[in-house]
Amino acid sequence: MVLTGVTSKAIRKGGAEPPLAAGAFRVYNMRFCPWAERAMLYVAAKGIDAEVINVNVTDKPEWYLKKHPLGKAPAIEHDGKVVIESLFIPEYLDDAFPENRILPTDPYEKVQQKLLVDQLNAVGGAAHLLFTVMRDRTLKDEKQVKVFEVLKMAEDLLKDEFFGGSKAGYADYLSFPFFEKIWWATALQVVDLPESSFPGLENYPKLTRWFDKMIHSDVVQSVTQSLEHGSAFMNAYATHQELDYDLGLDD
C-alpha cells in the first residue's frame, strides 16, 4: 500500500487541479476532518495505492466544487467516477476492491457492523460537545458528564479486541476518528480524561486497550495527525480562529 501526498499542502481557491493519471485512484482529504479520516483509514486498511489531494474546504478551489457540490471532504475519484460521503465510500471500496473486503459479506454480520457504527455515532456527538467547552469553559462539568456516559456506552459495546472482532473492521475504522477527537480535546483540558492510556484504564479498560492498538497501528499512523497539531486545529475551529490547513507541515 502506497499513499502519496498525505502531507501535501492543501489546495485552495485559485489552485490548479492536479492532473490525474489514467487508472489512478485519488482521495480528496482534509487532514483534520474525522469524516475524511474515515475514508483515509479505509483506503489504507484495504492496501489501495492512492494519491491524496488535501483540500482547503474553507477557501475551496473552484474545480473541486464540480466533484463535490458542497466542497466538503472526503471524496474519492476512481475510473472517472467521483464518490462522496464517508458512509458510502467504504462500501464502494469493498465492492470495487473485493479481494480485501472489510465489511462482512454475511448479511447478518454486515448489519451488525452497521448497527455498531450507528450506535457509535454518539461518540461524534460527544466530541462536538467539547467544542462548546472550548468556547465557554464554565460548561465543562455539564458537558463532560455526557461524554463520560457515551464512553461507557462504547465500553459496553466492545465485546472483543475490536468492534470488528479479533481484528479492526468496518466499525473500528468508521468510529475511531471521533474517539481520536475526544483524545485531542484532552490536551486542551476541556475534559477530565488522560492523554496517555486514553480514555482511562480504571473506567474504560476495554476501550483503553482498543484505542492503544488502533492509534499505534500502521493503518492509523499512515494517515493521522499528532495530538499537538490535532488539538491546536480543533481549538482554532471551535473558537472561530483562522484555520491553518497546513498546520504541522512546516515543522
Report each predicted region and the residues it spans.
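Alpha-helical scaffold segments in carbohydrate-active enzymes
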Residues: 38, 115, 119, 153, ...
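Substrate-binding/catalytic groove segments of enzymes
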Residues: 161, 183-190, 220-224
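Tryptophan-centric aromatic hotspots in well-structured domains and transmembrane helices
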Residues: 35, 84, 88, 175-179, ...
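GST superfamily/GST-like fold recognition
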Residues: 166-191, 200-203
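GST-like domain detector, emphasizing the conserved glutathione-binding G-site
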Residues: 1-167, 240-251
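A contiguous, mid-protein "functional segment" used to position or interact
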Residues: 202-231
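C-terminal/domain-terminus segments
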Residues: 227-244
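Membrane interface segments of multi-pass transport proteins and intramembrane proteases
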Residues: 103, 197-198
